[in-house]
């Protein structure tokens, strides 16, 4: 048994208030809860999908991967333990905070916290309503979206996420960033979404490179682009990726890592073949210096 989807993400941020404004007015998320020290946000019928907690890191804090049942959670726990990973069965306080029925946690080879759960809270009686009028986000069986981490050892990352957690490799991109710097990106999937997680040995001090939201319509992306562009907060221009074919742009967040906002990604198929690419984009995705 492997995990089924990316369910939620948590970030440690220096300025919760800025994130509350950013998530609602730039990304079109719906605020679910908020205080001076933390906030959560919705993008669909789930009680929350994104959490920000006050702290100095301005970086990745945790990811939550979903399974469909208690049995599935037990099977993932056994798989992790079989691969030498220490697993913690979380208690009632954190279970209540996450709004799930069962929860385990561990760390990947680089100390990144990973949570696996089942039984998330649905709020069909309180429909998602974007404050900016976003038509909706592609979630459901594909989960939240994706995120990309910088790791020190790609072989160790590949072993942990594919063998212990059950991800499958979608493809690889050898990306020449510039000035002779080249990195290899690994893209992993666990459902129809082309990738829910990716990693590479990237330059820079942050663990989180970016996270991605997939909107239901291209106009949603264009309207979001205009908001970022007006604030000179576009990091990479509109473009279309070679591997998942998503049309997207990248914007700056209040914490220094990026958010990818896209539409139109293709899905993995039953007879998917792993391939490699020499470029990240068919067109576009030109670097821009945010203000």
Swiss-Prot record:
Fe cation binds at residues 146, 210, 260. Keywords: Aromatic hydrocarbons catabolism, Dioxygenase, Iron, Metal-binding, Oxidoreductase, Repeat. Residues 5-119, 143-264 form the VOC domain. Pfam families: BphC_D1, Glyoxalase. CDD domains: BphC1-RGP6_C_like, BphC1-RGP6_N_like. InterPro entries: DiOHbiphenyl_dOase (IPR017626), Glyas_Bleomycin-R_OHBP_Dase (IPR029068), Glyas_Fos-R_dOase_dom (IPR004360), VOC (IPR037523), Xdiol_ring_cleave_dOase_1/2 (IPR000486). Pathway: Xenobiotic degradation; toluene degradation. Disulfide bonds: none annotated. Gene3D superfamilies: 2,3-Dihydroxybiphenyl 1,2-Dioxygenase, domain 1. Signal peptide: none annotated. One of its GO terms (molecular function) is dioxygenase activity. It catalyses: 3-methylcatechol + O2 = 2-hydroxy-6-oxo-2,4-heptadienoate + H(+). Its EC number is 1.13.11.-. One of its GO terms (biological process) is toluene catabolic process. Its cofactor is Fe(2+). The keyword ATP-binding does not apply. Homooctamer. Belongs to the extradiol ring-cleavage dioxygenase family. NCBIfam families: 23dbph12diox (TIGR03213). This is 3-methylcatechol 2,3-dioxygenase. The gene is todE.
């Amino acid at each position: 048994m492997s995990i089924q989807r990316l369910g939620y993400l948590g970030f440690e941020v220096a300025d919760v208030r800025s994130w509350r404004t950013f998530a609602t007015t730039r990304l079109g998320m719906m605020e679910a809860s908020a205080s001076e020290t933390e906030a959560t946000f919705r993008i669909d019928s789930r009680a929350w999908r994104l959490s920000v907690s006050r702290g100095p890191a301005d970086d990745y804090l945790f990811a939550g991967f979903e399974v469909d049942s208690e049995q599935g959670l037990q099977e993932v726990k056994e798989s992790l333990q079989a691969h030498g990973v220490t697993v913690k069965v979380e208690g009632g306080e954190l279970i209540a905070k996450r709004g799930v029925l069962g929860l385990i946690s561990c760390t990947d080879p680089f100390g990144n916290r990973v949570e696996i759960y089942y039984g998330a809270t649905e709020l069909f009686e309180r429909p998602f309503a974007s404050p900016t009028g976003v038509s909706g986000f592609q979630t459901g069986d594909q989960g939240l979206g994706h995120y990309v981490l910088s790791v020190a050892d790609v072989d160790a990352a590949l072993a942990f996420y594919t063998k212990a957690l059950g991800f499958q490799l979608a493809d690889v991109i050898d990306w020449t960033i510039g000035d002779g710097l080249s990195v290899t990106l690994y893209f992993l999937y666990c459902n129809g979404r082309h990738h829910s997680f990716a990693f590479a040995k990237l330059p820079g001090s942050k663990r989180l490179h970016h996270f991605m939201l997939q909107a239901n319509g291209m106009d949603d992306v264009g309207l979001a682009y205009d908001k970022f562009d007006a604030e000179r907060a576009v990091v990479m221009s509109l473009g279309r990726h070679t591997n998942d074919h998503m049309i997207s742009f990248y914007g700056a967040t209040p914490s220094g890592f990026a958010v990818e906002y896209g539409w139109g990604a293709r899905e993995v198929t039953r007879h998917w073949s792993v391939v490699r690419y020499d470029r990240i984009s068919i067109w576009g995705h030109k670097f821009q210096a945010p203000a």
